[in-house]
């Protein structure tokens, strides 16, 4: 019950930032229609085709939420000195992280649902089993990614530095994903083996499977993140300077 109450508080705080909310929702939606504008008439009402096209965009939206609505919020609350006032033991740390994870997971569901709804409306297509599975898969992938990447919120850096790191990371992932459409060899191939956006896209498409390298890499990240959550520092960086 306490977890749910805190999750609702954190969720309401995220909703109260309208510019970030609108930008996260609208930017990939506008980009999708920009890239597929000439195909609206050709694939009018084609839900099966849309299901294959939206996986990468769902991955981008979801990974953005993981980085900026989850990891960055954890860093921001730590650096504001907010959690140091009431989190003094492991139970408190886990309660805080768990509540933020639930709030961010709800936000990711809203983002993905809105994006898919707008795309289906634009193409006058009806949702089918494939679309429902994409939404359900995105939920459990988001939950896993948030848990696996929790260690990124434990870096002892300032909020601004963390924001810069996350921005660079999502840009690299986005660019490598786009480049792989034309060239997927060498370093581009290896980056995409651990690229969260590419992993989302792979899992959301039922005819593709993850490589052993990807599974091994994220298993290690999961273990590191569990340790990071248990030892999460609540004191802001500036307090020790």
From Swiss-Prot:
Q: Which GO terms describe its cellular component?
A: plasma membrane
Q: How does it sit in the membrane?
A: Multi-pass membrane protein
Q: Which residues cross the membrane?
A: 17-35, 54-72, 105-123, 131-149, 163-181, 212-230
Name of this protein: Protein McbE
Keywords (alphabetical) are: Antibiotic resistance, Cell membrane, Membrane, Plasmid, Transmembrane, Transmembrane helix, Transport
Any one of the GO BP annotations: response to antibiotic
Spell out the subcellular localization from the entry: Cell membrane
Organism whose genome encodes this protein:
Escherichia coli
Transport is among the record's keywords: yes
Q: What is the lineage of its organism?
A: Bacteria, Pseudomonadati, Pseudomonadota, Gammaproteobacteria, Enterobacterales
What is known about what this protein does? Together with two further proteins McbF and McbG this protein causes immunity to the peptide antibiotic microcin B17 (MccB17), which inhibits DNA replication in enterobacteriaceae. Immunity is determined by two different mechanisms. McbE is involved in the production of extracellular MccB17 and, in a complex with McbF it also serves as 'pump' for the export of active MccB17 from the cytoplasm to the periplasmic space.
């Amino acid at each position: 019950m306490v977890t749910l109450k805190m999750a609702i508080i954190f969720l309401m705080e995220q909703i109260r930032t309208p510019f970030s909310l609108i930008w996260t929702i609208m930017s990939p939606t506008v980009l999708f229609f920009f890239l597929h504008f000439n195909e609206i008439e050709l694939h009018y009402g084609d839900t099966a085709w849309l299901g294959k096209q939206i996986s990468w965009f769902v991955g981008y939206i979801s990974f953005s939420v993981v980085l900026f609505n989850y990891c960055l919020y954890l860093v921001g609350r730590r650096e504001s000195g907010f959690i140091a006032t009431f989190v003094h033991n492991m139970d408190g740390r886990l309660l805080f992280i768990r509540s933020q994870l639930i709030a961010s997971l709800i936000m990711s569901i809203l983002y993905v649902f809105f994006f898919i709804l707008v795309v289906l409306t634009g193409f006058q297509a009806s949702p089918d089993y494939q679309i429902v599975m994409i939404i359900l898969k995105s939920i459990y992938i988001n939950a896993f990614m948030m848990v696996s990447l929790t260690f990124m919120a434990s870096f002892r850096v300032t909020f601004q530095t963390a924001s810069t790191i996350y921005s660079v990371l999502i840009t690299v992932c986005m660019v490598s994903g786009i480049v792989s459409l034309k060239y997927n060899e060498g370093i581009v191939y290896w980056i995409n083996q651990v690229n969260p956006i590419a992993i989302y896209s792979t899992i959301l498409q039922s005819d593709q499977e993850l490589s052993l390298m990807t599974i091994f890499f994220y298993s290690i990240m999961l273990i590191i993140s569990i340790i990071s959550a248990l030892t999460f520092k609540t004191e802001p960086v500036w307090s020790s300077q």
